[in-house]
């Protein structure tokens, strides 16, 4: 199967500047392609996982992945498409974050000196020495403001009469220059990114075409959300990091184990390397099999990110907590902010918050009547303080009201 065919089959494709030509070229020869990552944390999280799997797919097909971290652009902060500009990072913070990002990526792709080995570059290498007057003289005439004003990210802001800063325009130019630089010095012919990057990518493609007449391409992926519309990468308890110093392999396993039923097949295609036979099995699932599929998905993705031993350990821990400990993972779940447990909460208040009592007085009555349990142990005192010490494997608390009503409290 060709790179482009597998790219589309797995659900990665959204747009391409010239798909037919790119398909032909990637069949005939090996190319270099790049993806850029924010340099704002010491680890990537699962919001970047589709892009990482694309780099892995590139490498598996013999193409060369180039990873760009925005050390240069991080020094001026991200463009303000959001309500609040991101913190401007120091050189030391950027270097530390870059090291962590490479650790995340090294779980999935190989860095080295071979033709298809990945390389990581920091755009500060060329942007720091870029003279503004020279840049305007050498490149300014190639950028069309008319064209830039038609980009969705700009057009929508103007239509809404929202502030549009000069920095945002400059950021587009710097990203275009990144592509030009990589094309010239690293023979990079493809830029990949999320669909929100389409305008910036096209500007880079146009710049290279006008200056050097080189044939380069841009291709984007769909923005990824869960089936309920939630953004990938974060939960109520925080980001789902790829590096184990920020999130344990068990918690990583549990994130995928608890994904929505409607997402299992899609996530398996996007993020796993299960074969066609396994996909077919997933697609023909009946309701009672969905939990087995979730376990397999969680196992495969944990193995890919951490190791097979880490996946086995996570599975064993889950069995110990939820099966041998008679806690069913499929119980109704409520989410509680970690800060509340860290401060401590009265037992009767927790039962009320969790929905096991319609009022605090009813919760008190439940406890006094010996009908309330926490982690299958009877609660004797309605004022008992529940805190993080009650968390099972740092993630859940089981509450029971009587014999038939049970809830899992997750942080």
From Swiss-Prot:
GO terms for molecular function: ATP binding; RNA binding; tyrosine-tRNA ligase activity. Pfam families: tRNA-synt_1b. ATP binds at residue 234. Its EC number is 6.1.1.1. It is an enzyme of class 6 (ligase). It is found in: Cytoplasm. A motif ('HIGH' region) lies at residues 39-48. PROSITE patterns: S4. Residues 345-411 form the S4 RNA-binding domain. Its main location: cytoplasm. L-tyrosine binds at residues 34, 171, 175. The keyword Protein biosynthesis applies. Belongs to the class-I aminoacyl-tRNA synthetase family. TyrS type 1 subfamily. Homodimer. Catalyzes the attachment of tyrosine to tRNA(Tyr) in a two-step reaction: tyrosine is first activated by ATP to form Tyr-AMP and then transferred to the acceptor end of tRNA(Tyr). This is Tyrosine--tRNA ligase. It comes from Rickettsia canadensis (strain McKiel). The lineage of its organism: Bacteria, Pseudomonadati, Pseudomonadota, Alphaproteobacteria, Rickettsiales.
């Amino acid at each position: 199967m060709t790179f482009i065919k597998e790219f589309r089959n797995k659900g990665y494709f959204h747009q391409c500047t010239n798909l037919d030509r790119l398909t032909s070229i990637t069949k005939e020869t090996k190319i270099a392609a790049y993806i850029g990552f924010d340099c704002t944390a010491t680890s990537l999280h699962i919001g970047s996982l589709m892009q990482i799997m694309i780099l892995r797919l590139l490498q598996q097909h013999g193409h060369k992945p180039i990873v760009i971290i925005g050390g240069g652009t991080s020094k001026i902060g991200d463009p303000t498409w959001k309500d609040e500009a991101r913190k401007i990072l120091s050189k030391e913070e950027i270097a530390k974050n870059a090291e962590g990002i490479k650790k995340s990526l090294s779980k999935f792709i190989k860095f080295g000196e071979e033709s298809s080995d990945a390389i990581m570059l920091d755009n500060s290498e060329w942007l720091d020495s870029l003279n503004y007057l020279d840049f305007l003289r050498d490149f300014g005439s190639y950028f069309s403001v008319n064209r830039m004003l038609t980009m969705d990210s700009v057009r929508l802001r103007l239509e809404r009469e929202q502030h549009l800063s000069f920095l945002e325009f400059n950021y587009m130019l710097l990203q275009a220059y990144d592509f030009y630089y990589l094309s010239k010095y690293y023979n990079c012919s493809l830029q990949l990114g999320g669909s929100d990057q389409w305008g910036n990518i096209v500007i880079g493609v146009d710049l290279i075409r006008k200056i050097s007449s080189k044939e380069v391409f841009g291709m984007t992926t769909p923005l990824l959300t869960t089936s309920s519309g939630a953004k990938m990468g974060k939960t109520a308890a925080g980001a789902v990091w790829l590096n184990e110093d920020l999130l344990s392999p068990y918690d990583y396993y549990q994130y995928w184990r608890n994904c929505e039923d409607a997402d299992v097949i899609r996530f398996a295609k996007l993020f796993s390397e299960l074969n066609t036979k396994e996909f077919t099995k997933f697609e023909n699932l009946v309701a009672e099999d969905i939990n087995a599929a979730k376990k397999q998905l969680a196992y495969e993705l944990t193995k890919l990110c951490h190791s097979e031993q880490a996946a086995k350990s996570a599975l064993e821990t889950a069995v110990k907590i939820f099966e041998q400990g008679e806690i069913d993972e499929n119980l109704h779940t409520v989410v509680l902010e970690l800060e509340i447990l860290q401060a401590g909460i009265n037992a009767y208040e927790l039962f009320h918050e969790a929905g096991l009592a319609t009022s605090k007085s009813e919760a008190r009555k439940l406890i006094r009547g010996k009908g309330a349990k926490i982690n299958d142990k009877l609660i004797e005192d309605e004022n008992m303080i529940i805190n993080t010490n009650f968390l099972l494997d740092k993630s859940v608390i089981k509450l029971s009201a009587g014999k038939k009503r049970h809830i899992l409290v997750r942080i």
